[in-house]
Amino acid sequence: MAPPSRRECPSPSWRFPGLLLAALVLLRSSCSDACGPPPTFEAMELTSRPKPYYKVGERVEYDCKKGYHHFAPFLTHSICDRNHTWLPISDEPCVRKVCHYIPNPLHGEAILANGSYSFGNQLHFICNDGYYLIGKEILYCELKGSDAVWSGRPPICQKILCKPPPKINNGKHTFSDVDVFEYLDAVTYSCDPAPGPDPFSLIGESTIYCRDNSVWSGDAPECKVVKCRFPVIENGKQIAGFGKKFYYKATVIFECDEGFHIIGSDTIVCNSNSTWDPPVPKCVK
């Protein structure tokens, strides 16, 4: 609340004594019994237009501003007293209107932005792990007519579920008999025995899990035969990764004979398309 004001009268100039004397008499007679503008409040406003000054005994009435309502039988008026000040209103009888209480959603939480349900505030919603929000994440306490109401319906927290992961050729995954998977449920893929002399290799991630957006964490892997040709290097030799056959992710390391230096990488890996990556290096002088 702004402090009550007292009407201050201007000091006259004496350049025209006759006229100013008469004006001074009139001015003093009105100002000496006058109060300045009435006090202002955060939650109340005048019911009539304010005047520049008020006579002793004049009374002004206040009412709650839009969005506020009376909560106690305190005074809602002030009077210009004989001391040319406004009788103070000790306590404002108006408080902000509030929206109705909204409980925590099942499997979630409702969080007030500043601990109050009064209009202008926000209510934030979050869900527990394993659940996702259906509806608006934030509701606003707004004025609708003379009431404080929420900007929408409270959201709900729905359990995160994934459909069964894809089946793959030449392989399988665990829990293949389950129809619905919950948040963070995981399945692991493996390859079947190959019908020929070379085994199937699992290409991709062997384990995937149900994520928070109800999709799997990655694509299903692939089971296929991956076999790279025997790596041959002239003027050099293989020093690691020996074998008769080279399947997926087989790693070979080379070095050049004395007097030669290597062009390319000394380490190569058999990748998923049955080629060496990077290519087999060369040894040159």
Swiss-Prot record:
Disulfide bonds join 35-80, 64-94, 99-141, 127-157, 162-210, 191-223, 228-270, 256-283. It comes from the Eukaryota. Gene3D superfamilies: Complement Module, domain 1. The keyword Transferase does not apply. Pfam families: Sushi. SMART domains: CCP. One of its GO terms (biological process) is single fertilization. Residues 1-32 form the signal peptide. The keyword Glycoprotein applies. Coiled coil: none annotated. Glycans are attached at residues 40, 47, 114. Its main location: membrane. Residues 33-96, 97-159, 160-225, 226-285 form the Sushi domain. It is a single-pass type I membrane protein. One of its GO terms (cellular component) is inner acrosomal membrane. PROSITE patterns: SUSHI. It is found in: Cytoplasmic vesicle, Secretory vesicle, Acrosome inner membrane. Keywords: Complement pathway, Cytoplasmic vesicle, Disulfide bond, Fertilization, Glycoprotein, Immunity, Innate immunity, Membrane, Repeat, Signal, Sushi. PANTHER family: COMPLEMENT COMPONENT-RELATED SUSHI DOMAIN-CONTAINING, MEMBRANE COFACTOR PROTEIN. Acts as a cofactor for complement factor I, a serine protease which protects autologous cells against complement-mediated injury by cleaving C3b and C4b deposited on host tissue. May be involved in the fusion of the spermatozoa with the oocyte during fertilization. Also acts as a costimulatory factor for T-cells which induces the differentiation of CD4+ into T-regulatory 1 cells. T-regulatory 1 cells suppress immune responses by secreting interleukin-10, and therefore are thought to prevent autoimmunity. Interacts with C3b. Interacts with C4b. Interacts with moesin/MSN. Sushi domains 3 and 4 are the most important for interaction with C3b and C4b. This is Membrane cofactor protein.
